[in-house]
Amino acid sequence: MDYNKILQGKYPAKQHAKRVSDYIRDKIPNATGVLYLEGRATKMIEDNDSEEHFRQRRYFYYLTGCPLADSYVIHDMDSSKTTLFIPPVDPESVIWSGLPVSAEEALSNWDVDEVKYTNEINATLAHVGASKANATLYAIPNQVSEKVTFLEFDHKNFSILKEAIEVTRVVKDEYEIAMIGKANQISSRAHELVMKKVKHVKNERELEAVFLAECISNGARDQAYHSIVAAGRAAATLHYVANNAPLDGKLNLLLDAGGEWNCYASDITRTFPINGKFTTESRAIYDIVLKMQLECIATLKEGVVWDDVHTLAHKIAIDGLLELGILKGDKEAILESRTSVAFFPHGLGHYLGMDTHDTGGNANYADKDTMFRYLRVRGTLPAGSVITVEPGLYFCNFIIEPFLNDPKHSQYINRPVLDRYWDVGGVRIEDNIVITKRGTQNLTTAVKDPDEMERLIASS
């Protein structure tokens, strides 16, 4: 798909500001006033004169599309006017960093009505506050600089703006979906390039370098999260990030990695054989996980209850593990006992957007039901949301051993058969899915058919 055509226009910041304002008015009838947000400030590395890697504050970006550090924005709820404040020229820094973005350039680049410099912020706030009787200033706690003052505003609300942005971010517009799609295009190609290189390198770190280089060379300079490049049994560790172990003697590689496109994330996982050919045990587990993913995706559309889809994934896993003989007994009893959590301990997926684990979802990490404790999304899925579908099966001794020592669970686990699967490590397959009124759109194009992956690896 040609996402570039959609992305030729400006990021729809004012549309987002309207949605946020409408949410506030829905909660506070007749609400009036100003939304105030700050971009992330430049930060220095501790005990060093170099800057930390910059990552724009997502709340600010949602209402501006502006990637500049040390910037502010005001959105007038009544007039719908958005004013962006960017850093002025600092003559002392020009020799080192060059000229910054000018007000004229900023007005051309981003969906705002006026651009001023940050040294005008307090005077502008004072003028706006004095001209609006009984107006409220809406801001986010701990995201207001000490030098910024709201003295002229009769009322200040620090409780609803963050909530309003987090809720409205769940449903994406066409532009946002194109951003996630663009990140997926680049990252999918990077995943396939890693598959082509896997037989020709000796260490996980070399494959991480391949992925990063492909993303950066195609414009995805930042990663959405720390890449997981896990060979062999390391793939049973969900968030393994050492990425520094040799590949020799190991069966499979689990690659969980995704680049960003202008602050929007991709989150993709593929698992494939290091030598280009799945073992019998690895292929059996892969086929179960792929079935889990495909059948779960097939059920998705607006209004589907995510908890039910997660349950379906466990049912498919149980059926598959019973067929292999790893599990034994009645499948309904196994489901009720939650024994399948030993092999599939995490949730089926999470919302995706500007953050990898995006806002919304209503997770309940205190849930006493272990099958749902780590499910990051609960309840119905709205059209326009983007969610990952990432089932997995893992053979982690540390996790499974307590189940083997508990009669409640051990009665359903066939230890002699299980022992043949430890070297499989873990298998996870993850795609990024747009929920529509009648179905889905899969943004992830990286190959996942096991025969195709084997051919791709062999072709290199």
From Swiss-Prot:
This is Probable Xaa-Pro aminopeptidase PEPP. Binds 2 manganese ions per subunit. Its EC number is 3.4.11.9. It comes from Podospora anserina (strain S / ATCC MYA-4624 / DSM 980 / FGSC 10383) (Pleurage anserina). SUPFAM superfamilies: Creatinase/aminopeptidase, Creatinase/prolidase N-terminal domain. It catalyses: Release of any N-terminal amino acid, including proline, that is linked to proline, even from a dipeptide or tripeptide. The keyword Hydrolase applies. Coiled coil: none annotated. InterPro entries: Aminopep_P_N (IPR007865), Creatin/AminoP/Spt16_N (IPR029149), Creatinase/aminopeptidase-like (IPR036005), Pept_M24 (IPR000994), X-Pro_dipept-like (IPR052433). Catalyzes the removal of a penultimate prolyl residue from the N-termini of peptides.
